């Protein structure tokens, strides 16, 4: 950070601002990142690799899938939209900033490749309840959290929202004009292609081992897959193990999307998001979702998943409608603490817990990172709106560039917050 003060100006200026850098600079912050391996080629890994390549860093990617954009990132079409909250909490801020970052990045990729990665349908975020809608109306009247440009979002009543979406909706909500649908898997592959990042697929990394020079990636037979001074873990639910961070706080959230016929909900013009969501994909099929099949429950039967999704569909519409289930899509998300991803240097949790044991009243220990080991994981259900922004932040931290985020957001995303939460639970 900088210490800013006013001083006497020069020329025709009465005053000028004078800044002195007060942030401590050490060998680690001045260390130049030159050679990086990214583990994982989903939305997180592909975006991190792209940003590193743009920064001039030599980077390559390893993943267990044959091609980038597999696993939970393999959606043919996913919804890209911000979320509104009247208090503009951290989740809403990251969602908005990430939405804009992803839209901008997709525009660049489409211009360079001629591919169609985005369908500009708009998106309607319907209020979950009448009370929430009233709260939104009150907030809009008071310009909370700030005045939103009409070109970005409009708050519509139920009738107007229904006309915009093409269906009779149960209540009103925010219409985000620049939202739409993204070819998620193709987005990942295009990032890698445009950045010319080498990809080693069909390769499972089971361990990341510290060496004097950096880190070794090992496979199931103990073989060395690769080595680099810096490694970024973007391996979804495998990230905690690979980052030596058992308290990273990622939770596996299996989920299923119900697919309907192309003739169902024929009037639907854009995605509608509320307790659940409905959308029409470019191939015509309608999708309804999605389930959150918590690990604490028994594995769900397919019929139970469809029933849950159709219940979500009913919560969005005024009148029930006849639809026919044709199939499903399923995947396992990795959700971070507080529904926020883990982005930053991997924490040396053993050293952190030792320091906390010596000073039980302290929860803010600096210098507890694992040098050269980084994490970007836990995007949850918001991979499209979180990934580009998270990658920007991480690569700025890695390259010691000016970090495009304030301190509160960096702390909220820090991988250290998992072990901090664990230590606090021990005190209860």
Model segments located where?
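C-terminal catalytic lobe of FAD-dependent flavoproteins
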Residues: 323-428
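Short beta-strand to alpha-helix junction loop
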Residues: 93-98, 130-132, 174-190, 300-305, ...
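Active-site substrate-recognition segment that forms the wall
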Residues: 37, 44-55, 64, 72-73, ...
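Dinucleotide-binding Rossmann-like beta1-alpha1 core, especially the glycine-rich loop
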Residues: 77-163
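Helix-loop-beta segment of a Rossmann-like dinucleotide-binding subdomain
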Residues: 86-87, 115-125, 149-194, 291-296, ...
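A short, basic/flexible loop-to-alpha-helix module at the beginning of a structural domain
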Residues: 17-33
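Helical element adjacent to the flavin cofactor pocket in flavoenzyme catalytic cores
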Residues: 1, 174-221, 225-226, 230, ...
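Beta1/beta-strand and adjacent pyrophosphate-binding region of the FAD-binding site
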Residues: 28-44
């Amino acid at each position: 950070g900088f210490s800013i003060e006013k001083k006497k100006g020069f020329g025709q200026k009465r005053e000028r601002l004078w800044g002195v850098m007060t942030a401590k600079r050490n060998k680690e912050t001045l260390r130049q990142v030159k050679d990086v391996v990214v583990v994982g080629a989903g939305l997180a890994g592909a975006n991190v690799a792209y940003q590193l390549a743009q920064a001039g860093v030599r980077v390559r990617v390893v993943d267990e899938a044959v091609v980038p954009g597999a696993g939970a990132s393999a959606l043919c079409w996913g919804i890209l939209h911000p979320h509104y909250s009247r208090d503009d909490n951290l989740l809403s801020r990251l969602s908005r900033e990430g939405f804009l970052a992803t839209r901008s990045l997709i525009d660049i990729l489409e211009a360079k490749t001629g591919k169609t990665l985005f369908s500009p349908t708009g998106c309607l975020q319907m209020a979950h309840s009448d009370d929430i809608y009233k709260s939104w109306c009150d907030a809009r009247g008071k310009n909370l959290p700030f005045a939103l440009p009409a070109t970005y979002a409009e708050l519509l009543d139920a009738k107007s929202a229904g006309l915009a979406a093409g269906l009779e909706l149960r209540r009103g909500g925010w219409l985000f004009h620049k939202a739409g649908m993204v070819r998620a898997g193709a987005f990942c592959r295009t990032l890698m292609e445009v950045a010319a990042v080498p990809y080693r697929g069909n390769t499972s990394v089971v361990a990341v081992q510290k060496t004097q020079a950096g880190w070794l990636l090992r496979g199931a037979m103990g073989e060395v897959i690769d080595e680099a001074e810096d490694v970024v873990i973007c391996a979804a639910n495998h990230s905690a193990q690979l980052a030596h961070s058992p308290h990273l706080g990622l939770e596996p959230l299996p989920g299923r999307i119900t697919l309907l016929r192309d003739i169902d909900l024929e009037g639907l013009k854009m995605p509608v998001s509320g307790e659940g969501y409905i959308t029409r994909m470019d191939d015509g099929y309608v999708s309804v979702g999605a389930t959150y099949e918590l690990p604490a429950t028994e594995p769900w039967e397919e019929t139970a998943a469809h029933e849950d999704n159709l219940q979500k569909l009913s919560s969005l519409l005024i009148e029930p409608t006849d639809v026919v289930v044709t199939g499903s899509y399923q995947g396992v998300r990795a959700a971070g603490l507080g529904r926020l991803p883990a982005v930053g240097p991997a924490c040396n949790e053993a050293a952190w817990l030792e320091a906390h044991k010596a000073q039980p009243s302290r929860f803010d220990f600096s210098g507890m990172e694992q040098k050269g080991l980084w994490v970007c994981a836990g995007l949850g259900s918001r991979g499209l709106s979180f990934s580009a922004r998270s990658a920007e932040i991480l690569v700025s931290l890695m390259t010691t560039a000016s970090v495009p985020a304030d301190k509160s957001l960096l702390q909220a995303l820090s991988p250290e917050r998992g072990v901090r939460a664990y230590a606090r639970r021990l005190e209860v």
